[in-house]
């Protein structure tokens, strides 16, 4: 199949996914794969999860969309679940980039300041404001002039603390940089950034689009670092595949976000809200403890089976968000293609990094089977490179 009628903005693999069940996907040729992508960190609860499917199916028999001209009980219920007992309010969007745009607008409007500090190798989205806060020149190429007032610092570098001054409106960061190479923030550094923001009156925005909804073994990744953001954004896993995003901010910020200050026609539609209302209560302490335990097994397996392979430079990440950094002799896309042949779907990130984002409900047998396949393919490719030298 060759796609003839769609802009070629994606470099696609030459097969289509036609079905999914649990943590496995099936393509248009009938081949089944173990999924270490979760739709790029979206389907954290896998495919055809009975509770989510039932919630969505039931909502489809009622209302799908009404716009935001009327009160919406589903939105308020999901917002309450996101607030999780804290004094926070929620703005719903359709995606992560929209949620980050809302955070940018709110930060500037509330503080009356324009300066934003972001970080190199970050990714916050592809719409103009979010792209301008993304520390990747490749993403920004050809789109100048970008949104002004945004500066960048080095991630995990104490020198960044000196750039947090009262003149800023906000600092935006990911606690684990996903697209940039799966680099986890150092706890002491993240806490120092949080403290400096509080001391200077600068808003701290944490982008949880990829790290949230249990990905690191916590409801939101920042909780595992003891952070207290003024605003956080979430999207990918929130509705397990339906388009939704959310900006969650302190209640006092509402003074700058009244009627007409921001909006979206589709945001918070009933079907996506039904899915999110089903997803969030499943993030129980028991499940999150299990995710952390399973992640520990995965990291142990990586340390013994994958890390010793000569082409592996380092392994980074947090929880079930993993980056295997490869020697330039082994292009990551070659690894991904070989793994597809073996029946495992994986992702890339950063310069030459194999990224793993399995569903958080995947059981140890499948997780370890996937790691074994990665070790097999990397060992084979190492042998091939050595033979050809």
From Swiss-Prot:
Chain sites annotated for binding N(2)-acetyl-L-ornithine: 126, 264
InterPro entries: AcOrn/SuccOrn_fam, Aminotrans_3, Aminotrans_3_PPA_site, Class-III_PLP-dep_AT, PyrdxlP-dep_Trfase, PyrdxlP-dep_Trfase_major, PyrdxlP-dep_Trfase_small
Reaction it catalyzes: N(2)-acetyl-L-ornithine + 2-oxoglutarate = N-acetyl-L-glutamate 5-semialdehyde + L-glutamate
GO-annotated biological processes: L-arginine biosynthetic process
Cofactors named for this entry: pyridoxal 5'-phosphate
Pathway noted in the entry: Amino-acid biosynthesis; L-arginine biosynthesis; N(2)-acetyl-L-ornithine from L-glutamate: step 4/4
SUPFAM superfamilies: PLP-dependent transferases (SSF53383)
Organism domain of life: Bacteria
Cofactor note text: Binds 1 pyridoxal phosphate per subunit.
A matching Pfam family: Aminotran_3
Modified positions (N6-(pyridoxal phosphate)lysine) in chain numbering: 236
Residues given in the record as pyridoxal 5'-phosphate binding sites: 96-97, 123, 207-210, 265
Single GO MF descriptor: N2-acetyl-L-ornithine:2-oxoglutarate 5-aminotransferase activity
Gene3D superfamilies documented for this protein: Aspartate Aminotransferase, domain 1 (3.90.1150.10), Type I PLP-dependent aspartate aminotransferase-like (Major domain) (3.40.640.10)
Known partners and oligomeric status: Homodimer.
Entry-linked PANTHER family: ACETYLORNITHINE AMINOTRANSFERASE, MITOCHONDRIAL, AMINOTRANSFERASE CLASS III
Record's protein name: Acetylornithine aminotransferase
Organism from which the protein derives: Lactiplantibacillus plantarum (strain ATCC BAA-793 / NCIMB 8826 / WCFS1) (Lactobacillus plantarum)
Native organism taxonomy: Bacteria, Bacillati, Bacillota, Bacilli, Lactobacillales
């Amino acid at each position: 199949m060759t796609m003839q009628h769609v802009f070629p903005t994606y470099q696609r693999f030459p097969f289509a996914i036609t079905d999914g069940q649990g943590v496995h996907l099936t393509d248009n040729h009938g081949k089944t794969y173990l999924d270490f992508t979760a739709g790029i960190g979206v389907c954290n609860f896998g495919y055809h999860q009975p509770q989510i499917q039932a919630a969505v199916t039931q909502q489809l028999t009622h209302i799908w969309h009404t716009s935001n001209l009327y009160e919406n009980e589903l939105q308020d219920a999901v917002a309450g679940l996101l607030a999780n007992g804290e004094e926070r309010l929620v703005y719903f969007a359709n995606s992560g980039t929209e949620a980050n745009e809302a955070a940018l607008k709110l930060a500037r409007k509330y503080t009356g300041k324009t300066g934003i500090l972001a970080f190199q190798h970050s990714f916050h989205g592809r719409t103009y404001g979010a792209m301008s806060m993304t520390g990747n020149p490749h993403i920004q190429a050809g789109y100048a002039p970008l949104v002004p007032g945004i500066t960048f610092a080095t991630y995990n570098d104490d020198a960044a603390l000196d750039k947090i001054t009262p003149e800023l409106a906000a600092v935006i960061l990911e606690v684990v940089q996903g697209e940039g190479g799966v680099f986890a923030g150092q706890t002491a550094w993240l806490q120092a950034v949080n403290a400096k923001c509080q001391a200077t009156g600068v808003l701290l925005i944490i982008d949880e689009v990829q790290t949230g909804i249990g990905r690191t073994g916590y409801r939101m990744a920042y909780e595992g670092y003891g952070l207290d953001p003024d605003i956080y954004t979430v999207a990918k896993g929130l509705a397990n595949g339906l388009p939704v995003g959310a900006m969650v901010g302190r209640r006092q910020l509402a003074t700058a976000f009244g009627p007409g200050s921001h909006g979206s026609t589709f945001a918070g539609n009933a079907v996506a809200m039904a899915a999110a209302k089903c997803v969030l209560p499943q993030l129980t302490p028991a499940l999150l403890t299990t995710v952390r335990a399973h992640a520990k097994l995965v990291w142990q397996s990586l340390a013994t089976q994958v890390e010793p392979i000569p082409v592996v430079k380092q392994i980074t990440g947090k929880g079930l968000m993993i980056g295997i950094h490869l020697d330039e002799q082994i292009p990551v896309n070659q690894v991904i293609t070989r793994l597809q042949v073996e029946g495992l779907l994986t992702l890339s990130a950063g310069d030459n990094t194999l990224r793993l984002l399995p569903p958080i409900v995947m059981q140890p047998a499948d997780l370890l089977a996937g790691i074994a396949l990665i070790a097999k393919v990397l060992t084979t490719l190492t042998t091939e490179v050595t033979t050809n030298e």
